[in-house]
């Protein structure tokens, strides 16, 4: 881990304290007064792109009693109008780490669940996020850790597909399922179907759209103004996932896009926890991956990066 050049500082976020982690390649801002939330991620070289994350306005209204705020958050799945939207407005327990920070919210009164997030800088362009849900209630809870990253609009997302098989060579069975939500319209130009990936042209979404997938190479990417954000969470073979088996989901409404990964479903007894790990990468200078050639370049870059994590 090459973290000796990481800087750790504090700043204000909407009247509350936040922590800033800075390397040569990026600056990350994490709230400590509410959340846990990662509210900003900027590239040093790609400063034109600004904050890659969506930031809701200061006068944001609550959504089902919950401030979305923007950025990256931890929820518990399956989605429920009461359980999922518990407010996270209280100050956090904060533990500084040599290469990052660990954060934990107070236990949610209505669910008995406590959310925690550990953020570690692995090198100048790589982050490791460990999400945890702990059951402090009186009975077992079936749930999954759900890591959602809200990225600002104007860009292009890619979801790689599994390698193609050959019918002639005896590949007779399916390898994954595509799971659209009830409001998803697959005829819209927001979806770009390619042989090796699905492209999502965010500005072309004029209403809420969402789909999930039951198996994929474990990474997704979002390109905006020359900066590419990648998140990686490998699929656990044989595990049962929420939402008809989805370890990955994507939501967009044209103003933003959410790249979402999930842990397997688990039944948490009182005192038990489930963890879910994502790795993030920030890359500059790659082309918009809307063509097969540009996607191939992105996939090669991401492949090398993933190998460096092991």
Predicted regions and their residues:
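Surface-exposed acidic/polar loop and edge beta-strand patches at domain peripheries
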Residues: 1-310
């Amino acid at each position: 881990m090459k973290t000796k050049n990481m800087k750790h500082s504090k700043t204000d976020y909407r009247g509350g304290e936040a922590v800033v982690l800075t390397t040569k390649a990026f600056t990350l801002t994490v709230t400590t007064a509410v959340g846990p939330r990662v509210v900003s991620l900027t590239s040093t070289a790609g400063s034109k792109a600004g904050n890659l994350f969506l930031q809701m306005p200061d006068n944001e209204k609550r959504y089902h009693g919950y401030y979305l705020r923007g950025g990256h958050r931890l929820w518990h799945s399956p989605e429920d109008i009461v359980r999922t939207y518990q407010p996270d407005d209280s100050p956090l327990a904060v533990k500084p780490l040599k290469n990052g920070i660990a954060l934990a919210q107070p236990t949610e009164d209505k669910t008995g669940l406590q959310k925690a997030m550990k953020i570690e800088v692995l090198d100048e362009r790589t982050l490791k996020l460990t999400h945890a849900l702990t059951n402090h209630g009186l009975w077992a809870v079936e749930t999954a850790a759900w890591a959602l990253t809200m990225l600002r609009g104007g860009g292009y997302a890619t979801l790689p597909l599994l390698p193609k098989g050959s019918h002639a060579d005896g590949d007779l069975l399916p390898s994954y399922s595509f799971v659209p939500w009830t409001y998803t319209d697959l005829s819209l130009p927001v979806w770009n179907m390619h042989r090796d990936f699905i492209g999502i042209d965010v500005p072309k979404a004029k209403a809420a759209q969402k789909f999930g997938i039951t198996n994929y190479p474990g990474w997704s990417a979002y390109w905006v103004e020359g900066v590419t954000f990648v998140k990686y969470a490998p699929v656990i073979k044989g595990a049962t996932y929420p939402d008809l088996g989805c370890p990955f989901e994507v939501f967009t409404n044209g103003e933003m896009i959410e790249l979402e990964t999930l842990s397997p479903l688990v039944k948490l007894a009182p005192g038990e926890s489930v963890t879910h790990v994502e790795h993030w990468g920030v890359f500059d200078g790659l082309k918009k991956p809307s063509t097969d050639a540009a996607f191939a370049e992105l996939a090669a870059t991401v492949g090398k990066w993933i190998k460096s994590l092991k």
